[in-house]
Amino acid sequence: MRILGIDPGLARVGYGVIDTSNGQQQMLDCGIIRTNPGIDDGVRMVEIASDLRQLIRRWKPQLAAVEKFFFYRSSTTISVVQARGVIIMTLARFRVPMVEFPPMQIKLALAGSGHAEKDEVLDAVMRELNLDQPPRPDDAADALAIALTGWFQR
């Protein structure tokens, strides 16, 4: 199964693509969709949708796993929620089934504790995907953790 993990954001959307054929997890791609903070939010969301479309067309995921936004008070809360809506809409448009996980569930699935530290989750990602180097940037590593959670929780 090919799974696209997504760590939503407006400035940076982390993505990670894994393949789980033959009972092993393998990283195929990871990175970020970056938008320019100096332009209108609507244009930034169009960029996110466009880049996500390209990823979907390239990798043809059978499942998308998206981090569920947990509410907190911040000046970026609304824009992140809006960007997440664009991501969900784009996945639906391409009929990619989607599952959502809150951060604590991702930490629990990978590190065994919902209160695990970021480095514990990163170590688990590296171990599960047999990586010698940590994926960069952090948003991409987070997206791989989300994709792995999608696989583990299926």
Curated annotation (Swiss-Prot):
GO biological process: DNA recombination; DNA repair
Oxidoreductase listed as a keyword: no
Active site: D7, E67, D139
SUPFAM superfamilies linked to this entry: Ribonuclease H-like
Cofactor info, note text: Binds 2 Mg(2+) ion per subunit.
Catalytic activity entry: Endonucleolytic cleavage at a junction such as a reciprocal single-stranded crossover between two homologous DNA duplexes (Holliday junction)
GO cellular component terms listed in the entry, alphabetical order: cytoplasm; Holliday junction resolvase complex
Keywords: Cytoplasm, DNA damage, DNA recombination, DNA repair, DNA-binding, Endonuclease, Hydrolase, Magnesium, Metal-binding, Nuclease
NCBIfam families: PRK00039.2-1
Role played: The RuvA-RuvB-RuvC complex processes Holliday junction (HJ) DNA during genetic recombination and DNA repair. Endonuclease that resolves HJ intermediates. Cleaves cruciform DNA by making single-stranded nicks across the HJ at symmetrical positions within the homologous arms, yielding a 5'-phosphate and a 3'-hydroxyl group; requires a central core of homology in the junction. The consensus cleavage sequence is 5'-(A/T)TT(C/G)-3'. Cleavage occurs on the 3'-side of the TT dinucleotide at the point of strand exchange.
Subunit text: Homodimer which binds Holliday junction (HJ) DNA. The HJ becomes 2-fold symmetrical on binding to RuvC with unstacked arms; it has a different conformation from HJ DNA in complex with RuvA. In the full resolvosome a probable DNA-RuvA(4)-RuvB(12)-RuvC(2) complex forms which resolves the HJ.
Name by which UniProt lists this protein: Crossover junction endodeoxyribonuclease RuvC
